[in-house]
Amino acid sequence: MLPPNVTGGLFWHWQAWRSAALWRPTVEALEFWLKLQTKDTRSEALVIIGASAGWMMPIDWLCQFKEVHTFDIDPLAAPLFRWRHGKKLRQNGTALTCLTQNALSDLPSLLKAHPQACIFFDNVLGQLRFTESGVQLAEKNISQIVQCLKGREWGSVHDRMSGPVNGALKLGGDDKALCPERPGHLDKSVDAQTWLSSINAQSPWLDHLTGNVFDKNTAVHNVDWAFKPNYWHWLQAGWVRP
């Protein structure tokens, strides 16, 4: 879904592969959250926008659906997604279609092509600030995407902020401090500061312009992601039901 120099290309996939142990606590936290969101869904199809190779996609969650359709602009994403998840999905009877395509270039047509599917944005909305020419344009595009999804079941996990940490938190093992989690929008500065302080965040942290993706009626879950030992991302997750 993103240009290869952002979250695609050979180096990105190599980095994701070698970071599996570091990322595992976040993947496990997201798996629990995702299963909770779709346990009562009536949709049998899932569309993943910005799927990459599914490095953080829990296979057991994917197997809940009869169809999985992935979209990503990175030409390596589709074959690597099939390599990582294809066999298990086939064994489960889940049909997998992986397309190399910019799904956001014509989102209305994609929604019409998959009228009953759940739509999931896999860490893509927070990257739009890097692919657009300015902050205002990125914010406008995010708002237009959200408007386009009215009446649909959809979810997103995306970067809310990212930045350096002082490395004091222990990495590895089963330590719950590895992956701090907290519900709520955290839209008040004091709440955000408390959250960032809990992971020893060091200024400056980058705002990914996703603070208004979800309205106040949508339950939001926050998860930290140790992208690198000394550089973490604050992930915001939410699921919208029609």
Question: Which positions does each model-derived feature cover?
Answer:
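Conserved class I S-adenosyl-L-methionine
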Residues: 42-54
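S-adenosyl-L-methionine
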Residues: 83-113
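Conserved SAM/SAH-binding beta-strand->alpha-helix loop
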Residues: 74
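Conserved beta-strand signature within the Rossmann-like core of class I S-adenosyl-L-methionine
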Residues: 120-121, 141-144, 148-162
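Class I SAM-dependent methyltransferase Rossmann-like catalytic core
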Residues: 1-43
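A short SAM/SAH-binding and catalytic strip from SAM-dependent methyltransferases
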Residues: 110, 116-135
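Conserved SAM-binding loop of SAM-dependent methyltransferases across substrates and taxa
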Residues: 52-65
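Charged, low-complexity C-terminal accessory regions
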Residues: 162-242
